[in-house]
Amino acid sequence: MPKGTEPTMPASSYSGVQALPPRRIKVIGVPLDLGASRRGVDMGPSAVRVAGLEARLESLGHEVNDGGNIAVAIAETKHVGEHHARYLKEITDTCTKAAEMVEHALQDGMTPVVLGGDHSVAAGTVSGVATFYRKQHQKIGLIWIDAHADLNTPETSPSGNVHGMPLAALVGLGPEPLANILGFSPKVAPENVVIIGVRDIDITEKENIRRAGISEVYTMRDIDERGMRTVMEEALRAAGRGTAGYHISLDMDWIDPEDAPGVGTPVRGGATYREAHLAMEIIADHGRMVSFEIVEVNPVIDEHNRTADLAVELISSAFGKKIL
């Protein structure tokens, strides 16, 4: 067929070659914004759903069950609490609910896909995954894809915003209520934690990386110099070593604001559109992802839902969509 005469596909149709066996996927919305100072990420799960997540995943042969949203507290009805860890009680309560839902999804043989919400929800998501595999005497790996390290604690945080603390909680540095969700800490061994794409990191977070014993940290400079494929191959090997598989925690501010404008804490110099897709495609190629979450989509400051649309595209790539 000559170029330019191809039939136009309906807007609701998607093409893609499946690289993964069909999965049963459980979508869990966590519309939490108490961990961030900028409001709006509580609408992230709805924006991602409106962008066609379910149809995209089903077009790849996966079975999708949407569990709806977890009920969360709103700032207008709660006291901020300790200013060094704002709304910590409410965030811990929400993350505990998320952890339980994620664990139940895995018990039912489903792959959890969690939609945030700010990045504090990861303290719940990863706790649920770690609990499920711990009961089988197995460990998990963690791929943390983010412009920020999220390794602050109440003692080091300049803002008191808990969305800057979830990775610290997961490796056992605190805050203690988040670190001990479902009764144990740490959730992930430091040798199986990989941070990718960081480019805005506090001095105290650098110290906490060393304290925690995390050695696999790839900055945007590493990606620039060595390429996304090399970085991802090394990262997945480290996260997968001696584990049942790994959780993917993707903060949309990892991507350059030119392509993902609808995030609460944008940082120039992020991953390009194609770099982000390549990272997800390599994750799909390896086939060892046990759970996935995408966070910090903020429709209030987005441009025509571009960031949510991209979030759906990236989830699709992580679940097997290919160009050819």
Give the location of each predicted region.
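A general structural motif
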Residues: 174, 194-202, 230-232, 272-277
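Catalytic cores of soluble, metal-dependent hydrolases
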Residues: 2-32, 38-113, 125, 132-135, ...
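Active-site environment of divalent metal-dependent phosphoester hydrolases
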Residues: 152, 201-203, 299-301
